[in-house]
């Protein structure tokens, strides 16, 4: 148990001690289901303090949801530093090998309300709170390395545009509507980020299969006081990969909690999600080495130019005990930094330093939100702040001001020092004329969007074209559609623009402005997801379809083999009743074909069976749809023995992800290989005729 979990233990109750129900002031109850009335049929009496206390508490159970990132999932874990990084930063949690720091992570979507579906197309928030020995450090990032706007002043406009439209609160959790494309069509700095969202990055397969990015340039300050600019990255050990759009939409309807559930189940089963924290480092005087400004949050530094240096590893190993108390009340603030970590002058970051503390005041109801158990630091904390709503600490002593003599000057100030000193901002030299001007170095809005497009594989490009087509087609105003294509897409890539324009029936209009000069559009292979797979099948989900007459050994051997390789295998049947195998053994399905459709899995195995089982399956429309849908979603499918006739029945064209054999031994290696490649991309051009 780490320091944070130990601390939380003190606040936990299992409601079995005391044994008897009481009011909030400890008075035991003799009735908790009937109000106090004047006679059994009489009116309720105002005197009923038990009823009033219960209803009053209920009436106030909700707090405002986050204005953005309302839908999210949280869990506990720890961070392990790979080594002593003190040459880079004096941050204590990176100061020695295997230094272990408790963390709480919250991964979220951005635009949807709390009850929206997990698999909508969106940016995903990736926020980590490190409970370090020197105070809390919050790294509040996203699963994409760039942002839509360059200056904090546009954030409210951006959010108003992307969230549900004000007159009818539609659409829920989706950017496919007029106000978003109206804003972005008029705001070219958003081009790069919108492209990321339209790529497969916008629909990750699970929470553990996505990267995290700090986005802004921050500073590391080392023991000598030297500053190095740093961009922080989280790389998932499970690899980075995504759903298909059709899958994502169907999952949103059949299990809107899909991501949350999968994350929860992985943690419960001991298959812990892990990420490596890495840093791109840039000496102060090297910041001009690029053709873009490293203070501009719409730009990334290609990894091929500046490699990501590994710093440590995060393991997420424990679900919360109470969603509201932990995940909902956790308060991330960009302003929570520790000595050794500091800000840059990125104008978006500067606004964020203010915004998070400010928003917690209304969301969590006052200035004492850091005293809520999930937010409390694990190191001692003290200052002269007092009072306010829901103050928990009982401060003793007569003086709550600095300086004081009455309390002998306590709490004292700590000198900044090489390590374990007080926080002191990096002494950056600043001078300038007050103005609203934006730096000329922020003017190039398209080079990196083109670089991202050029970095995509063919199937990723096809998905982007389809995503823009879907999204912009949902805009009801023709001028919004036309402007987005002509103001934005044309400037990213002509093929992209032409294909989307054709699909939307939009005319590409010759622009009167001079062509945009682009720099650095060379592909960056690190941006393309097929290059980011883990090479294994850890945490992949496989369904095994069993019906009466299935071969017991084939099921068990396949299951054992795949589980040894780290996959999660579920036995699925038409009902939850026990299934009698060909040799008389019994198997218990864990899910049904209807309740656990193939969209919830990465691969399907239909084991060796008797003719009887084959007949049952061939006559079952739900099963046939299951296979067709898995095929359409480019999944690995294997048939054992006689069931392979189903392939012919469904007229599925052969490819390397459709496997036939007489039992698991014939297909297991190819199954593993195909699944480790995530999807059977070669099939994609052939599936448009599949009716699923
Ligand atoms: C000026 C620009 C921005 C402003 C003003 C802003 C403001 C906010 C606000 C008010 C919240 C709700 C916080 C809460 O109620 O607890 C929030 C959440 C969040 N923001 Fe931002 N944001 C900005 C840009 C960004 C950027 C660039 C990123 C990514 C690098 C980001 C990542 C997040 C994340 C991950 C959360 C959810 C935190 C959680 O899980 O509780 N935001 N933001």
UniProtKB/Swiss-Prot annotation:
MF terms (GO), sorted A to Z: catalase activity; heme binding; metal ion binding
Temperature-related properties: Thermostable. Still active after heating at 65 degrees Celsius for 15 minures.
Positions with a binding annotation for heme: 356
Cross-referenced InterPro entries: Catalase (IPR018028), Catalase_AS (IPR024708), Catalase_clade2 (IPR024712), Catalase_clade2_helical (IPR043156), Catalase_core (IPR011614), Catalase_haem_BS (IPR002226), Catalase_immune_responsive (IPR010582), Catalase_large_C (IPR041399)
GO cellular component, one term: cytosol
Gene Ontology biological process terms from the UniProt entry: hydrogen peroxide catabolic process; response to oxidative stress; response to reactive oxygen species; sorocarp development
Record PANTHER family: CATALASE, CATALASE-B
Biological function: Occurs in almost all aerobically respiring organisms and serves to protect cells from the toxic effects of hydrogen peroxide. Its accumulation in prespore cells affords the spores protection from oxidation during prolonged dormancy. Required for normal developmental timing, possibly through a regulatory role in differentiation and morphogenesis.
This protein's name: Catalase-B
